[in-house]
UniProtKB/Swiss-Prot annotation:
Swiss-Prot/TrEMBL domain comment: Has the structural arrangement of an alpha-helix connected to antiparallel beta-sheets by disulfide bonds (CS-alpha/beta).
Annotated organism of origin: Centruroides tecomanus (Scorpion)
GO cellular component: extracellular region
Subcellular location: Secreted
Chief localisation class: secreted
Disulphide-bridged cysteine pairs: 12-65, 16-41, 25-46, 29-48
Protein's name according to its UniProt entry: Beta-toxin Ct71
Biological role: Beta toxins bind voltage-independently at site-4 of sodium channels (Nav) and shift the voltage of activation toward more negative potentials thereby affecting sodium channel activation and promoting spontaneous and repetitive firing. Lethal to mice.
Residue intervals of the LCN-type CS-alpha/beta domain: 1-66
InterPro entries attached to this UniProt entry: LCN-type_CS_alpha_beta_dom (IPR044062), Scorpion_toxin-like (IPR003614), Scorpion_toxin-like_sf (IPR036574), Scorpion_toxinL (IPR018218)
Alphabetical UniProt keywords: Amidation, Disulfide bond, Ion channel impairing toxin, Neurotoxin, Secreted, Toxin, Voltage-gated sodium channel impairing toxin
Additional record remark: Is neutralized by the single-chain antibody variable fragment HV.
GO MF entries: sodium channel inhibitor activity; toxin activity
Length: 66
């Protein structure tokens, strides 16, 4: 599974500005989903890869980013 890492509080994606390989996104994806996860900056959001099927990613149901 893949997807944008999401802030559970506000429903927003984790933003990033350095597209492609991005240490911040990799660190955040691994922190949330485990050290087997990958992560990079895609369309100014942190995109996580190699996730388990039940991983919660953006968008959150009934929670819009404000």
């Amino acid at each position: 599974k893949e997807g944008y890492i999401v802030n559970y509080h506000d429903g927003c994606k984790y933003e990033c500005y350095k597209l492609g390989d991005n240490d911040y996104c990799l660190r955040e994806c691994r922190s949330r989903y485990g050290k087997g996860a990958g992560g990079y900056c895609y369309a100014f959001g942190c995109w996580c890869t190699h996730l388990y099927e039940q991983a919660v990613v953006w968008p959150l149901p009934k929670k819009t980013c404000n």
